């Protein structure tokens, strides 16, 4: 699939402040920098086994509409009421600047690549082009139905690489450091 054939790249992310969501957000930001229409799509929980995908998609849709609702409220009323914690609840893993959110699971299934982390069982978005990025050890090592036979597998580090799924040892590593982490906000303006 060439760049011209790719309509969108959707990166499935989960909302928590941890290394996996940060790296997925950083991947989204880097893909956007080089010209791809990459977006994050949040899921409220991991799929740990076979589930009814229709019911799970409804749960995901409700969750993303709730995030959208919080974003709209924050945009309209951020000066009137302190919505910083209210907004953070909806976008807790979006600390990497330069990303875009996919709120609805509506996309061209043939011309979209969906990137799933290793903790997502199956293909809940029903995409035809799936990339599995192993950011940690494979939690479904003994379950052949967890991943599709045509999925493209990559690992974050060689130690996390499942050799049966990725014998070529394809590795994609992205480093991210929050430059605002040690910034002091309580200091006055510096003079002299």
Regions found by a protein language model. Give the residues of each.
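Catalytic core of nucleotide-activated saccharide and alditol-phosphate transferases
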Residues: 95-192
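N-terminal pre-catalytic "stem/leader" segment of glycosyltransferase-like enzymes
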Residues: 1-113
């Amino acid at each position: 699939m060439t760049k011209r054939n790719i309509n969108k790249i959707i990166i499935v992310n989960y909302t928590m402040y941890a290394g996996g969501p940060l790296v997925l957000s950083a991947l989204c930001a880097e893909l956007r920098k080089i010209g791809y229409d990459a977006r994050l799509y949040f899921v409220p929980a991991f799929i740990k086994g076979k589930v009814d995908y229709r019911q799970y998609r409804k749960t995901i849709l409700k969750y993303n509409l709730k995030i959208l609702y919080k974003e709209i409220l924050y945009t309209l009323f951020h000066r009137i009421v302190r919505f910083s914690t209210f907004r953070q609840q909806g976008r807790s893993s979006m600390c990497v600047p330069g990303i875009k959110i996919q709120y609805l699971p509506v996309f061209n299934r043939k011309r979209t690549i969906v990137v799933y982390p290793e903790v997502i069982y199956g293909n809940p978005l029903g995409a035809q082009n799936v990339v599995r990025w192993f950011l940690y050890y494979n939690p479904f090592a003994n379950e052949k139905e967890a991943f599709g036979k045509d999925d493209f597998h990559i690992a974050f580090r060689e130690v996390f690489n499942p050799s049966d799924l990725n014998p070529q040892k394809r590795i994609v590593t992205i480093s991210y450091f929050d430059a605002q982490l040690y910034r002091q906000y309580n200091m006055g303006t510096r003079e002299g």
